[in-house]
Amino acid sequence: MLFRSPPNMNTVPGVDMSTGSLGQGISTACGMALAARLQNNPCRVYTLLGDGEIQEGQVWEACMFASHYKLDNLCVIIDNNGLQIDGNIADVMSPYPIVDKLQAFGLHTIAVDGHNFDELEAAFAEAKTVKGKPTAIVMTTTKGKGVSFMENNAGWHGKSTNPAEFEIAMGELKAALAELEA
C-alpha cells in the first residue's frame, strides 16, 4: 500500500521528502521553494499537512518564513478532517480557526470541500495565479470517507485492516465508484 503511513520518498513517485506528524515537511518545502526561486527554476512546491500536524509551532514559523519571503511558488495543502491519533483535534489542541490563522500569517487561503474534485481543481488553478505570497488550500474532509466503519473514527489513524475488513472496505469503495461511473 502506498499510503499506509506518511508517503515514503523511496516508494512514491513525486514525493521528495518523507515527513510525518511533526510539521517538518512545510519547513523543507519553504527551503525548496526559496531555492527554486534563487535558481530561477519555475517549479511549484506542494506540501501536505494534517490538521493535527498544524498544532506544531514549526508549522507557524514556516508560514511566517514563507510569507516574509513571498514564496508564491509554495502551495500548502491542509487536510482538515477534525481528527488525529489522539482523537478530536478540538479536544486535544484546537488549531481553529485555521483559515483565519493562515490569513493572519500572510498566506492566500482557499477553503474547499476536499471531496469535491471540481473545487479542488479550481483551488489548484487559483493557487498558480497568486503572486507575492504563498497559498494554502484548506480541505474539509471526512476521515475514512467511503468506508462505513472508518468514517470519522480516529481509531483508524495509522491502523491497517485485517483481511475481512479489507474486503468490506473495498466492496464499499467499489460500489461508490460504480455509482459515480453510472
Segment roles from a protein language model:
Residues 56-81, 136-139:
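A short alpha/beta connector and helix-capping loop motif
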Residues 43-47, 74, 133-141:
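Generic beta-sheet signal
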Residues 40-43, 90-123, 174, 178-182:
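Conserved thiamine diphosphate
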